[in-house]
């Protein structure tokens, strides 16, 4: 050692080999590489619970009434480090619950409150979520007390419910059962912007046409939940804002009445905070120093008084009595004329003209003072827009009706991504079946499975038809909001029976044979569809020389048209299916990216996606009987031929001009052996997927391939069987 290797800057002398910074991912060199990480983000390696931990069993053992009582009591337990407005944290907790649930969007089912994702980046640091870091810390004593059984996801939503209860509203109900994740969601696309609150033009085709908001987004800016409270791009215009309110709420499956109820009911309590200059507010939690311990948005003006808090920059309460559920929102909004003004922080807001002193809310900490109430541009939209105005007039005339509509809309908002009612736990689950829950009647478990299988095997249906139909029925499942799947057999109902991806003519033929079998044996059509897929699969396994049973769990039910909101299922229509090598049209997004997205929604790992694609190809179940990717001379047998031939260097691969297809040619003769799409060749091109492909191409893994395919197939068929774990 001559000292030449000494760091002259005084840096750490230890060689750091770990890539611990977020700005140094492996893919930084190849930004267009397929991001397989989205398939492995919430596995056992990130979960601190014991392998045998049963969260649903733990939840069922909770003392629900004690939990609710503790959360309700917390509302008025004022803390010096973050004082409550008027000594009541209700408004803050409602905002926490709302902003946790309000990220849900129906286009892909992502977002929402079901996983406690608001604890993690980027949501925990969105500008719209300022001060919610404090709300979560206020809840920590309750979370600490009840431990694993009370997830953050449940506690956050429960806090909103109990806030309303403590302020006089009887809520519609509550379901426990959400399970926490342990890190950021990397599969969710929140927008392409690299700047908080970047101009809305970045995500609209035409800002004057709210419907041109980029799919699947449901917020007007990066970092906001819905709309800009000051107006479109921060420019007040209630009529224009109304159109964006309508579009953003519609994208989370709310109609006009639900939207008006949530807006008015959400702003019946609490206040906005805008004392001080935004330039004086500190950075968000993810950017704050280590000594901040997860807190962000430090406020040098905050002197321990709620009056001086800063959150959105808008300042004031909406109603005269912000800690009471009443009709005060309507009284002020429609009882006064309003004029545009600015908050102390310089944000646009509206204030009433010539308001009576008794209608002014008192100061949050000094009851001897009163302040002007305020309305945001979105609130004024409820008055200016004729449709919202008419709805509000109906609410004003019937307070009980308003409370009921709001209670139901709030329940929908906070439970939309929990899935069917079988996922709910606790004494406050409403008995009523709600159509947005996609209700399914209980199915039979009394019929003879072996007898039904025999009937199916003798039906004359081909293995390919049975496998394809079962797959099409099950592939609609989305783990994001737990919608879709084979249970309910909605593939036989509108709109699914007419989807291009389901090959309507072939589907009608198959259902015409399977439905009578179901009727005659006492099985549900849903069960028979899946069982037929299993029969076809077992036939293909036997043809390949193996004897492997495909597991089956009976008990699926058949939904009716009356139990199905057909329009709400439009978003589940597959635009592409890499597993059946099909896409409806040419898209800017590649076939392999769409396949990856579908695999993530199905809850598959990269290995499961790989084995399923390879197996589906050789089974000959491509959409429209396409031959792309069928790398075998014995189609219909469940063999690893797809992988064997993909990795065989006797062949070369060549793009076909003007098409998203490729030719696989014999290197020696130049003859075309097979054709393929990018959804096929990616398994040889991507280094990670090739590693999996090589496993199944090995001589010693032919039977493993069959077993792994069956396991992955069964996982998809049972993805929506929440009743099995209830």
Swiss-Prot record:
Keywords: Heme, Hydrogen peroxide, Iron, Metal-binding, Oxidoreductase, Peroxidase
Transmembrane portions of the chain: none
Site of covalent link Tryptophyl-tyrosyl-methioninium (Trp-Tyr) (with M-252): 98-226
Cross-link Tryptophyl-tyrosyl-methioninium (Tyr-Met) (with W-98) mapped to chain: 226-252
Pfam families assigned: peroxidase (PF00141)
Cofactor binding annotation: Binds 1 heme b (iron(II)-protoporphyrin IX) group per dimer.
Family, per entry: Belongs to the peroxidase family. Peroxidase/catalase subfamily.
Domain of life of the source: Bacteria
Species name: Roseobacter denitrificans (strain ATCC 33942 / OCh 114) (Erythrobacter sp. (strain OCh 114))
Name by which UniProt lists this protein: Catalase-peroxidase
Subunit structure: Homodimer or homotetramer.
Biological classification of the source: Bacteria, Pseudomonadati, Pseudomonadota, Alphaproteobacteria, Rhodobacterales
Molecular function per GO: catalase activity; heme binding; metal ion binding
């Amino acid at each position: 050692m001559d000292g030449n290797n000494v760091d002259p800057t005084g840096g750490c002398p230890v060689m750091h080999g770990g890539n611990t910074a977020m700005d140094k991912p492996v893919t930084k060199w190849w930004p267009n590489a397929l991001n397989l990480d989205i398939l492995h983000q919430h596995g056992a390696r990130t979960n601190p619970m014991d392998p045998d931990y049963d969260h649903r069993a733990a939840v069922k053992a909770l003392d629900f009434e004690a939990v609710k009582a503790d959360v309700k009591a917390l509302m008025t337990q004022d803390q010096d480090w973050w004082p409550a407005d008027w000594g009541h944290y209700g408004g803050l907790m409602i905002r926490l619950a709302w902003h946790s649930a309000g990220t849900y969007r129906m286009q892909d089912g992502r977002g929402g409150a079901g996983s406690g994702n608001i604890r993690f980046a980027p949501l925990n640091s969105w500008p719209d979520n300022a001060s919610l870091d404090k709300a979560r810390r206020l809840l920590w004593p309750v979370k600490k007390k009840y431990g694993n059984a009370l997830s953050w996801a449940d506690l956050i939503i429960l806090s909103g419910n109990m806030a309303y209860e403590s302020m006089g509203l009887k809520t519609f109900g509550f379901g426990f059962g959400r399970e926490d994740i342990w890190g950021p969601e990397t599969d969710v696309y929140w927008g392409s912007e690299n700047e908080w609150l970047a101009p809305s033009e970045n995500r609209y085709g035409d800002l004057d046409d709210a419907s041109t908001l980029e799919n699947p987004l449901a917020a007007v800016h990066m970092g906001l939940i819905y709309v800009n409270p000051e107006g479109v791009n921060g420019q007040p215009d209630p009529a224009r804002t109304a159109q964006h309110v309508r579009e953003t709420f519609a994208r989370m499956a709310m109609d006009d009445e639900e939207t008006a109820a949530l807006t008015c009911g959400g702003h019946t309590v609490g206040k906005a905070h805008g004392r001080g200059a935004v330039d004086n507010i500190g950075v968000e939690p993810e950017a704050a120093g280590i000594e901040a311990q997860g807190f962000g948005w430090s406020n040098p003006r905050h002197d321990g008084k709620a009056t001086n808090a800063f959150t959105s920059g808008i300042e004031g309460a909406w109603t005269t009595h912000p800690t009471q559920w009443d009709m005060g929102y309507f009284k002020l909004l429609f009882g006064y004329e309003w004029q545009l003004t600015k908050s102390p922080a310089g944000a646009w807001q509206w204030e009433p003209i010539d308001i009576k002193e008794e209608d002014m809310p008192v100061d949050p900490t000094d009851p001897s003072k009163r302040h002007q109430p305020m309305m945001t541009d979105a609130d004024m939209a409820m008055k200016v827009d004729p449709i919202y105005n008419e709805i509000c007039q109906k609410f004003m005339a019937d307070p009980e009706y308003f409370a009921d509509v709001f209670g139901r809309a709030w329940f929908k908002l906070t439970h939309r991504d929990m899935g069917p009612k079988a996922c709910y736990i606790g004494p406050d689950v409403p008995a009523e079946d709600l159509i947005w829950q996609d209700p399914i009647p209980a199915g039979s478990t009394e019929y003879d499975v072996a007898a039904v299988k025999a009937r199916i095997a003798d039906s004359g249906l081909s293995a390919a038809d049975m496998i394809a139909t079962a797959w099409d029925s099950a592939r609609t499942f989305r783990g994001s909001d737990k919608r879709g799947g084979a249970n309910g057999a909605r593939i036989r109902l509108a709109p699914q029976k007419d989807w291009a991806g389901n090959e309507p003519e072939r589907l009608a033929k198959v259902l015409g044979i399977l439905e009578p079998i179901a009727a005659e044996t006492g099985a549900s059509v849903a069960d028979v569809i899946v069982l037929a897929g299993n029969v076809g699969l077992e036939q293909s396994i036997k043809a390949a020389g193996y004897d492997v049973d495909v597991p089956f769990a009976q008990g699926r039910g058949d939904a009716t048209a009356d139990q199905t909101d057909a329009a709400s299922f439009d978003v589940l229509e597959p635009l592409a299916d890499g597993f059946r090598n099909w896409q409806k049209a040419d898209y800017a997004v590649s076939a392999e990216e769409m396949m990856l997205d579908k695999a993530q929604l199905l809850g598959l790992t990269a290995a499961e996606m790989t084995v399923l694609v390879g197996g589906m190809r050789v089974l000959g179940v491509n959409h429209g009987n396409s031959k792309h990717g069928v790398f075998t001379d014995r189609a219909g047998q469940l063999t690893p031929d797809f992988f064997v031939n993909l990795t065989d260097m006797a062949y070369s691969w060549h793009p076909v001009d003007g098409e998203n297809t490729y030719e696989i040619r014999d290197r020696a003769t130049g003859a075309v052996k097979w054709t393929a799409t990018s959804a096929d060749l990616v398994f040889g091109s991507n280094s990670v997927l090739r590693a999996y492909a090589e496993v199944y191409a090995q001589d010693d893994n032919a039977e493993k391939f069959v077993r792994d395919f069956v396991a992955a197939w069964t996982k998809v068929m049972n993805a929506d069987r929440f009743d099995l774990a209830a």
